[in-house]
Curated annotation (Swiss-Prot):
Keywords in alphabetical order: Cytoplasm, Kinase, Phosphoprotein, Phosphotransferase system, Sugar transport, Transferase, Transport
A family per Pfam: PTS_EIIA_2
Biological process (GO), any one: phosphoenolpyruvate-dependent sugar phosphotransferase system
Keyword Protein biosynthesis in annotation: no
Species per Swiss-Prot/TrEMBL record: Salmonella typhi
Annotated protein name in UniProt: Multiphosphoryl transfer protein
Top-level taxon in the UniProt lineage: Bacteria
Function of the molecule: The phosphoenolpyruvate-dependent sugar phosphotransferase system (sugar PTS), a major carbohydrate active transport system, catalyzes the phosphorylation of incoming sugar substrates concomitantly with their translocation across the cell membrane. The enzyme II FruAB PTS system is involved in fructose transport.
Annotated ranges, domain HPr: 285-375
Length: 376
């Protein structure tokens, strides 16, 4: 995780246009010892290739691969423009984060930033902040409540089990490892019997020891019998705010519609989608998987190409990094796509729902195969 100093943050700046803003940011990077004088040319050239506007009033100007030799050390300079700077057609940036990084160092930094900035409320606060200290706290996530923890790290599938205790222990351990619960929660959820929701689904929680909101799921390879009742999957909930309620509602909808069997046969990505996305509950969803071959993964430029391809269609489209957290993201949001942390060789699953879903998936596959603007 990169560290951000208040000396690298410049609130209340004012410029006439995007080029002026980029030159000002490049000068700050040079003064801080991050880049040599020629880096500004790469920053301006990058904007000619594709806009570095992420969305939510945020831009991330940075150089091209041709000017990586101008980078002396990795760093950022943050400029806030309260009156806004036109960054492209229909794009107004209120915060520009100038990035200097050689190789693919900037990808980790970018992923950290986008996880914070993808929160719409944080982006709004960045516009109105008045001090460097306040901006730093927002960018480092210090003012952001922790998001619900429900991803590949809190799921255990295909467990050889013949009793609920095995699943209880696995879920409790996952939540403890995630820092979501304390020892009291672990003891309570292992010792107390879970609740039978029906259709092979069981649920447990604890009123004690909830440190952050999280959900753990464990599933047996084969269903087993518990006092005459079917058991195959256990959901354990740690609740520190209202975030888990949406997951429980989706779980309830699956049970009410007698579709809980989907949870018992789905792979990890589909199971996560069923619990975190309302679209996954419908029957008319198409999906396709593609492997990203771009040398540096989905950074801003290929990410923009992917999002622009998706925006050509009316269907609702989500994208899941099967080699990442496994959680689906809105395919129309560059911020959320970049935050997926896609590297070369990662598998992406796209789901599309709508009248042109089939055409959309084909176009996405063709774009990825063609290299998303960086060559196949």
């Amino acid at each position: 995780m990169f560290q951000l100093s208040v000396q690298d943050i410049h609130p209340g700046e004012q410029v006439g246009n995007k080029e002026e803003a980029i030159r000002q940011i490049a000068a700050a990077l040079a003064q801080a010892g991050n880049v040599a004088g020629g880096y500004v040319d790469g920053m301006l050239a990058r904007e000619q290739q594709t806009s570095t506007f992420l969305g939510n009033g945020i831009a991330i100007p940075h150089g091209t691969t041709d000017t990586r030799d101008q980078v002396l050390k990795t760093g950022v300079q943050v400029f806030q423009f309260p009156q806004g700077v036109t960054w492209g057609e229909g794009q107004v940036a209120y915060v520009a984060i100038g990035i200097a990084a050689s190789s693919d160092e900037h990808l980790g930094l970018l992923r950290q930033l986008t996880h914070v900035l993808s929160d719409d409320s944080v982006a709004e606060q960045l516009k109105s902040a008045t001090t460097a200290e306040e901006l730093r706290a927002l960018l480092m996530g210090e003012k952001q409540s922790e998001q619900l923890k429900l991803d590949n790290e809190t799921m255990t599938l295909d467990v050889i089990a013949s009793s609920l205790v095995t699943l209880q222990a696995l879920n409790a351990a996952r939540l403890k490892e995630a820092g979501a619960v304390d020892a009291a929660f672990v003891a309570k959820t292992i010792n107390d019997s879970p609740m039978n929701l029906g259709q092979g689904i069981w649920l447990n929680d604890s009123a004690e020891g909830n440190l952050r909101s999280a959900v753990a799921v464990s599933r047996a390879t084969q269903a087993f019998d518990v006092e005459g009742e079917k058991a195959a999957l256990l959901v354990t909930v740690a609740m520190n705010d209202e975030q888990p309620i949406a997951v429980l509602k989706r779980l309830g909808d699956l049970l009410l519609n007698n579709k809980a069997d989907r949870l018992l046969s789905a792979d990890a990505a589909t199971l996560l989608a069923l619990l975190t996305s309302d679209d996954a509950l419908t029957d008319d969803v198409l999906s396709a998987e593609f492997v990203v071959r771009n040398e540096h993964g989905l950074h801003a430029r290929p990410g923009t190409m992917l999002v622009n391809t998706i925006k050509q269609f009316n269907s609702e489209i989500t994208v899941t990094n099967l080699d990442g957290t496994g959680k689906p993201a809105n395919g129309r949001s560059l911020m959320k796509v970049v935050a997926l942390g896609v590297k070369k060789g990662h598998r992406l699953r796209f789901t599309a729902q709508g009248e042109d879903a089939e055409q959309a998936l084909k176009a996405i596959g063709d774009a990825i195969a063609a290299g998303l603007g960086e060559g196949a």
